[in-house]
Amino acid sequence: MEENFKRILREKVSELNLSLDPLQEEKFYLYYMALKEWNRKINLTSLEGEEEIILKHFVDSLSCIIPIRNENIERIIDIGTGAGFPGIPIKIYDEKYKLTLLESQKKKILFLEELIKILELSDVEIVWDRAENLGKDPRYREQFDLALARGVAKPNIVLEYALPFVKTGGIFLGQATPNNLSEWENAQKVVGILGGKTEEKIEINFDNITRIFLKIRKINNTPEKYPRRPGIPEKRPLLP
């Protein structure tokens, strides 16, 4: 089972023109086993098949590396990380990053804490809070080179969660599909309100999956009133 897992992982990762060393492959296998075990107790993922998890969680997360490879990135925040996607796969791939995982559900925090021990990852901070609260905290506000938020909310909502964390000159990496790209394009006014500018769109294809990344550069400080109080961005989204 383990060797089959690693073989599939290698094949799928190679479609991104990336490669993993044996230790990285082992860590992804341990991640997979922990995910399967904990998923019996709490709802971490609806995916069950080995290849499906490899492709739609691990490889999809690693695809985020492509748009940022030439950027000077040290600190990353993964907002609404859930079971650790995409932050932990990125950290496994390159341990130089200092990673903050933000999650509002306590049961998922417990999984992440256990997972970090299993994978023996350093420079990983796990924070139990909401983005609307943490984005006001001076220890986190505008402190990150890169913010990620995978499948958290619609673009005009997730932008309000994410951009306050990004330092001037840093990046929020929006993750779109052909089906929702228009929502990102319609949210460009919100990008500007929050201090960002969409620099480029990068399309990546692997295993019949298309991902479109929007590299949003932080060019101005986010106005102090954002993010608004918990729940408000979702109830009253900033209009495109």
From Swiss-Prot:
Source organism superkingdom: Bacteria
One term of GO molecular function: rRNA (guanine-N7-)-methyltransferase activity
Ligand binding (S-adenosyl-L-methionine): G80, F85, A131, E132, R150
Keywords assigned: Cytoplasm, Methyltransferase, rRNA processing, S-adenosyl-L-methionine, Transferase
Any single GO CC term annotated in Swiss-Prot or TrEMBL for this entry: cytosol
Chief localisation class: cytoplasm
Gene3D superfamilies: Vaccinia Virus protein VP39
EC number: 2.1.1.-
Function in brief: Specifically methylates the N7 position of a guanine in 16S rRNA.
Family per similarity comment: Belongs to the methyltransferase superfamily. RNA methyltransferase RsmG family.
Name the record gives this protein: Ribosomal RNA small subunit methyltransferase G
Source organism per UniProt: Dictyoglomus thermophilum (strain ATCC 35947 / DSM 3960 / H-6-12)
Lineage: Bacteria, Pseudomonadati, Dictyoglomota, Dictyoglomia, Dictyoglomales
Gene (name only): rsmG
